[in-house]
Amino acid sequence: MPKDQDLPSDKSPTTSNLQRSSRIQKALQEASDQGKIKIEDKNGQRRMDMLRSHLNPDTQKQEKSSHVTTSEKGVKSSTKSSSPEPQKQQNVFPTDELTAYLSPFSPKENKAREKVVQAMRDRPDLFHPYDIDLSRIEKLDLNYERMKYLVKEKKCFSVDTLEHEPATHFAAMSAVAYFDPALSVKTMLQFNFWAGTLLSLGTQRHRKYFDKIDSLELMGSYAITELAHGSNVRGIQTTATYCADSDTFEIHTPSREACKWWIGNSRHCHMCLVFAQLIVGKENHGVHCFVVPVRDSTSNEILPGVIIGDCTVKEGLDNLDNGFLLFNNVHIPRENLLNKHGDVTEAGKYQSPYKNASQRFGAMLSTLTMGRYSICGSSTVSLAKTLATTIGFSFERRQFGISNKPENPVINFQAQKHTIYPMLAEYFAFRFASNHLHHLYVNRTPETSQTLHVLSAGFKAYLTDRNQSSILKLREKCGGLGYSQLNRIGLTIANHDIFKTFEGDNTVLFQEVSKYLLANFKNIMSQKYSNVFSSVGYYVLDSLNSNVKGRHLRNATDLLDSNFYLTLFETKLEKQVQSVATRFRDILNELQLSNKESIPKDERKEVNKFNAWNLVQTQLLETSIAYVENEILQIFHNKVKDCPHKQTKQILQKQLHLFVLGLIEKNSTYFLTHDLMSPKLVKQLVKEKARVISSMEDGEILGLTKTLVPDVVYAPICNYEGIMKGVVSTDPSPMYDGMLIQALNNRQLFGNATFETIGLQNIKQ
């Protein structure tokens, strides 16, 4: 019987982890003897203090400082360079109000985040930045130890909270996402997917697992994807055949291409939720979910008939244990079928509350909606972390200038601002969009399920596409130092990349949106309100066109009139839906006439529909993007309009304006070719965008950056402490010392550099 020799038990850490822990303790002791421990301890404490303050703004205390800060007198700038004169002092920046307004969680829910933060503060030996040079097995061990600590020792997560207070559960999970996406995914697999699927697809008989899920005695995994099938879940080949003589299901992998692939928690799981084709007698009832034991929960030995392998090194998320699984005629009790939407009785008869197989299939995959909603939040966090690092770097990094004068902070260069600031505005749009999805999910009802499905698919695809592109550009804006793993931008790029295909390939998800747009086309054109569209409602195209005055606006500032830009994007969406629907219909009619004799009658409808869809696929994707952009714009506009705090509203209004101008610019080709805007106005648009960017003062940008993320990303090129205090430093040397400190605190493979040899033995931070 195969056995995991290196699998850590719940009672003791692995040998490699013990060795690593010993090395860390030895290094800490040596650093203490040499006076270096003050650096690590102080930084670690400061980072966790910042994290605590950020994640719980309701209890945040105003920091007393002798520095001049944005929260007191505006940003202080004593730079004696060729940069513009220091800007006038600003009003008190509403950090607390803005942070609270950006949060989707209530004060009570934020306490769950605070609990996670405090737990991390209590264990700096586990939650530290010195893990980038660990071996892969050490990374897996460390990730598992971190999860065990948060779940078993600190009780930060439970199935009961997930079931009865889902918003509180997601609040706690969000704190983990800020620290490490792989730790977040591993914890989500145990609770959101393993326990969450039992809750959503199972019945009373499956609640017996919950206590052991909380204690991690039963680690779980979630197996849909196969080597040959990812997006096409209907096509998976793993079978679950009912055996009447033994009242069991036989789980079987019929071919190597049917092996389950990318299965998270594969190194530690005892149980696996296996999606397979349910076969009763000679009839295939489609994809259902089964609880399949894969390891002995006491010995951790792999069970007979189960084969588990390692998918090995990935592009990112290296500290997440993804594996592959095969099943050789493994028998499980009939009760292990998650039977909420379909069951096999003791008499061996299949029954389901759904008469429509497609509706049943959709219900079976309901947990994917939760995954897509979670990815929207995680993707937005990834953008926020990279923005904070890049903005902090840009204020401190100095390059070029007038002869015999100090060099300029790179934030003063137009190219830097015109790249970063529009992405900052986009972040706030995405933050509110993710929050909107959060509220839809935790308050979901059968009536809102369709809207939730469409928005989670569309937002996940759009946000991850845009954010991956933005993070790559932000890396470039940090120059060569941004390439260093010490600053974690490259790690963020690698970890975030999977979000574009994780929980649904983005191209496929956009087509999910397209299906609903076409299905609701008749309602839109007859002026009926459609539950798929959460916007303000729609009008007949002629009416919309008459309201768009893009060719007749007096000047570019009129572009920021909400009546104009809301109608502009509604019109664009209407036109695109009408165009693609008409083209799809015409192609379908042509195909029906052309192959009337060549294709059997019983196959003709499906074949023609498939081919017609493929011929308009690119246009369908463009239409889905138009829908998502319109929804995000509506959400951002409404959040700014409804903001109760005057100063916060003014700050967000400027971000909304920059987002609107960027969105119009992105779609300007469409507006020009469809006579919705004139070439002259497009030129004015570029100037207006530059004007809005120029109006954003340093103190305002630092104040906004303060709300992005806590000081937990461990990027030495960013002065997070300065951002938190609103201080523009005139001395960038701590940033460069930070690079050296981080390098020396990680494993040195060559050379003779030490804290002493480079003069850092007495540095104070």
What are the residue ranges of the model-derived segments?
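Flavin-dependent oxidoreductase catalytic core characteristic
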Residues: 2-765
